[in-house]
Amino acid sequence: MIALVIQPSSEADLEEPILEVEGLSVVRSGKLVIQDIDLTILKGEFVGIVGPNGSGKTTLLLSILGILNADSGQIKIYGSKPMSKNLDGKISWVSQAASNLPSDLRLTVRELVELGTLNRSNMFSRRRDKQQVDQAIEMVGLKDVENTDIGRLSGGQRQRAVIGRALASKAEFILLDEPLVGMDSESRSSLLKLLDDLCHDADKTILMVSHDLAAIRQTAHRMIYLEETIKFDGDTSIFPDLTELAELRGIKPVHDEVHGHHHHSHKGAGEDL
């Protein structure tokens, strides 16, 4: 009965599971890529996923989005299956291709962000859309370049514009796949601050995959180490250092700089996974 549907209080909201994954296994091209994944993400969490190349990080994201089918197990987002109609506008994906948009793309920042407002239910309410777009552009710090073509922006600015599109959609759950790729350290820091602000001030829930261990440590509340299955899931403050990670993987580390203050963006610096 409809009368029994009660809006939870904001206090209960804090414990509301946004994502529930149980016993998820996915086979791609005949190979088991992820197996027996159990994962629950609560409203307002910022969760980082790290792991070596080919460990199943992107596969997990694509499964959550419903782009890849599970071979076993189940996924629920806001209590619904991936791709359900009632998830329209609630979930948004920022892929690593965002910063590689073609340089001759004839689309301004504002036009790209506006795409986020289009869905089945709001095709005719342009006034509200404009307000959403203005707010999203402001939040990602691109007001000065809102009428500039995407192709003329730096990789970091492009990535911000794509996140702006996600914000304009009013999505509450944002998934990011390697959003820091190709960014200089200044762009990376400002993007991480933006994501942190979105969690704290805008009540978003974020799931981010990255090779950049130091960046995830700096921003995420909770970290997951994935290598086919989840080998660590806990508070960022107790995430293993590289020596302990090597033990998880059964390999010897080259060297460990995670607890130092070095923050290299290139591979082989001891910080990238």
Question: Each PLM stretch: what is its role?
Answer:
Residues 210-211:
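H-loop/switch region of ABC-family ATPase nucleotide-binding domains
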Residues 73-87:
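Conserved ABC transporter NBD signature motif
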Residues 237-273:
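ABC ATPase nucleotide-binding domains
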Residues 114, 127-145:
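Conserved ABC ATPase "signature" region
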Residues 65:
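Helix-to-loop junction immediately C-terminal to a conserved catalytic motif
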